[in-house]
């Protein structure tokens, strides 16, 4: 009974933080719509860039947060070894993505139609790399059943993001589209600093054999999900 109560409590916290987060983020839509000039692309620039962000997040994490849960709970592999290996894998993917993205920033910006504002994409590449990496510590918090810590970090990002947007676009009457991406970068970086406790206190190891099994599991899971969608 105690386990059921704990599960119900954690589920409620995760669910509430997600619902509240989505609702608060929707509050930024009218702010952007009014503040961003249509001549510069307006809110369309923000939505277009964030669409690419969502796609790259899926590619970079490649289901490893789910794989971490599966292997950390299988009773065979040492959980902290799984966590460390997953951090190395996703961190490596994110770093490679960021290096290549910044190296070819101007060609990519031109291809996407942002040749005059390449750093819109540059800033969001940094955000994507950090967000993808942060997905693993967030999964680790769920594994540890630290629902309050999980929710507090998620909501802290949202409140900080909304506050800075309101200060610039409403209080200061700003109209620069790029500031929306800069604010996101600042908030994401702040959360990364807040996650330092989840990134220390254990031995960092990269288990090649474990990583191979995890990647196989991810490919198998992705393949099965793909078949369901067809």
Each model region followed by its residue ranges:
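Residue-level recognition of transmembrane alpha-helices
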Residues: 14, 18, 47-50, 90, ...
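Signature of the first transmembrane helix
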Residues: 6-65, 94, 98-102, 161-162, ...
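Hydrophobic alpha-helical transmembrane segments
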Residues: 118, 122, 151-202, 213
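Short membrane-interface helical motifs at transmembrane helix boundaries
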Residues: 96-114
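Helix-capping/transition residues at the boundaries of transmembrane alpha-helices
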Residues: 33, 109, 142, 169-172
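Transmembrane-helix boundary and interhelical linker motifs in polytopic inner-membrane proteins
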Residues: 4-5, 33-43, 56-90, 142-149
């Amino acid at each position: 009974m105690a386990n059921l109560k704990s599960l119900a409590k954690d589920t409620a916290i995760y669910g509430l933080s997600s619902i509240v987060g989505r609702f608060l983020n929707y509050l930024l839509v009218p702010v952007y719509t009014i503040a961003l000039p249509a001549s510069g692309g307006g809110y369309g620039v923000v939505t277009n860039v964030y669409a690419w962000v969502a796609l790259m997040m899926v590619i970079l994490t490649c289901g490893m947060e789910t794989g971490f849960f599966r292997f950390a709970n299988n009773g065979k592999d040492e959980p902290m070894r799984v966590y460390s290996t997953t951090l190395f894998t996703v961190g490596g993917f994110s770093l490679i993505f960021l290096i290549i993205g910044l190296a070819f920033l101007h060609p990519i910006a031109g291809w996407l139609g942002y040749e005059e504002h390449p750093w819109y994409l540059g800033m969001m590449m940094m955000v994507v790399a950090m967000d993808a990496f942060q997905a693993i510590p967030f999964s680790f918090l769920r594994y540890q059943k630290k629902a309050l810590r999980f929710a507090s970090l998620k909501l802290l990002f949202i409140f900080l993001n909304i506050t800075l947007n309101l200060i610039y676009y409403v209080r200061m009457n700003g109209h620069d589209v790029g500031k929306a991406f800069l604010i996101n970068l600042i908030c994401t970086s702040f959360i990364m600093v807040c996650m330092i406790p989840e990134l220390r206190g254990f031995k960092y190891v990269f288990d090649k054999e474990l990583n191979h099994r995890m990647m196989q599991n991810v490919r198998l899971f992705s393949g099965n999900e793909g078949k369901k969608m067809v």
